[in-house]
Amino acid sequence: MTKSFFGGIWHDRYILASFVNRDLQARYRRSLLGVLWAIITPLALSIIIGTVYAVLFNQDIKVTIPILFAGLNPWTFITASAGGGNTAFINAEGYLKQLSVNPQIFPLRTVCIGFINLLYSMMAFYVLYLVLQPQAFGAEMLMVVPGLLIMFVFCWGFAQIASVANL
């Protein structure tokens, strides 16, 4: 069962890559800033909310904003994966009727799109962290990589469950 599941996804990997690429291009096509929206939106939200929290609760703004940004990025990815997985088969109805592809690529498609946006915003997080707290920036920051992979697998499973539950 596992071999056929992953084998089907591996067999349709080029279709999956094409869908992800096309969805990302369509998402940012008519935008003046393009992919920068994936960076600017969580960054601006973190700066605004972090500034308000720092003033209201008398906290150091250099600590509050990176912590808020570090929590907002994964949360945005999880909610995008769950929401996209919930409607993955409904949105792909036309493809499922016309093409002979593994249907499990459609929830994975939404998770891949969210993960790419997460990687963009993580780059902004590292730059922000380097600017606000350069003394705390070190090799231990690389420990986020295994965490991102675990979160990708979790969100993929969650999107699979949500997509099947919504049929």
Briefly describe each language-model feature range.
Residues M1-L167:
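Hydrophobic transmembrane alpha-helices and immediately adjacent juxtamembrane helices
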